[in-house]
Amino acid sequence: MADLSQIVKAYDVRGVVPDQWDESLAELFGAAFAEITGADAIVIGHDMRPSSPGLSGAFARGAAARGTGVTLIGLCSTDELYFASGSLGLPGAMFTASHNPAQYNGIKMCRAGAAPVGQDTGLAEIRALVERWADEGAPPPAATTGTVTRRDVLGDYAAHLRGLVDLSGIRPLKVVVDAGNGMGGHTVPTVFEGLPLELDAMYFELDGSFPHHEANPLDPKNIVDLQARVRETGADLGLAFDGDADRCFVVDENGDPVSPSAITALVAARELAKHPGGTVIHNLITSWSVPEVVRENGGEPVRTRVGHSFIKEEMAKSGAIFGGEHSAHYYFRDFWNADTGMLAAMHVLAALGGQQGPLSELVAQYDRYAASGEINSTVDDQAGRLAALKAAHQDRAGVTLDELDGLTVTADDWWFNVRASNTEPLLRLNVEARDAATADRVRDEVLAVIRA
């Protein structure tokens, strides 16, 4: 019996090629995706990894063999695939392993309108079909093979984004962009073309071997080059995209990282100016500043668990205009509730270019507290350590506990959250406080229990 448990994750397919999966499995995934969605046609895109064209082509053959029409959009970012799914009204599949090393590849799937496909929304059924067909053989082809066509949507994607954020009137800005040899090198030149931006392009050559650094800007070592270039050139800001360019990380004119919570608050304020009284989603480890800014701007903040499936589900349910996560994923109602780091970056450029001050001053109003960042601890007994933390705090005066996602403990001047990793023996700690000394004290107290 084929076992796909190592590569079928909560939200996508991801594993080492060809050790864990290959084109023969990709073809079965294409057939299963066509079967489960029941679509007449689908759209497929891929990133710059060496294995991506072959895997995406095999997926297309599998879907076409079931009688499903296929539109191939070729090289694209993940949010460009979401644009294609939304604008064409088709289910989609994106071949990428995002920020993972070169030997990995994966599939992010969505239904028409960029609606997510995860374990509870079709991925479990797709896995079951692939496992069955891997053992019994693929089903016989449909009477009529689906037509495979090619389409370039990059220009339409760029035009759609530029229609959502007007950058034409901003003051000229010098911006350094580190694409990490990922798909930002493909999308940024077209999106930024003709705008009042002096673009300093770093690592725009598409190269799935990632010769300069991993395409994961949340790891501080991967933005060192960007920070240095911003400081050396006197740029107004720096932007770093991950491998599939759906996440964007920002550094200010001093080369200092801007927290994704501050970006979430800034974008929320701008979206609320367009959609007064709207709802904004934030996960439970974003800063206190996010719900504060949302309320100050007349909006309604809604707190969710960590993870894009929870954000997108809540956005669809509440009609939210925007959602943000600590991981630099940003979701927009105007983009089919899907995440697009490019659109968030354009909001930052518009906000910065619409006034005269530097970015560090602009974001200071949204960055109000001291935070630990995420601290991971290897723990054999995750449940036991969480229980010990709960026992240590449940009778303390002036604190509240909730277990929406892991354990969150909140006091007047600090809070912390501890969550177990779904895939590794780790506990993840995030602390925030009104001052750095308090944040350090709470961090050390909690780690003492976690690592006891």
Could you tell me what each predicted segment is?
Residues 1-61, 65-67, 91, 147-173:
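An N-terminal, well-structured beta->alpha segment
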Residues 40-47, 71, 174-176, 278-284, ...:
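Short glycine-rich phosphate-binding loop at a beta-alpha junction
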Residues 42-105, 162, 190-251:
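N-terminal small/polar loop signature for handling phosphorylated ligands or for N-terminal nucleophile
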Residues 70-79, 257-260, 282-283, 304-305:
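Active-site nucleophile and cofactor-binding loops and adjacent substrate-binding regions
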Residues 105-233:
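Gly/Ser/Thr-enriched, mixed-charge loops and adjacent short helices
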Residues 196, 201-203, 256-275, 308, ...:
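Gly/Ser/Thr-rich active-site loops/lids in small-molecule metabolic enzymes
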Residues 237, 275-452:
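Phosphate-binding and adjacent anionic-ligand microenvironments
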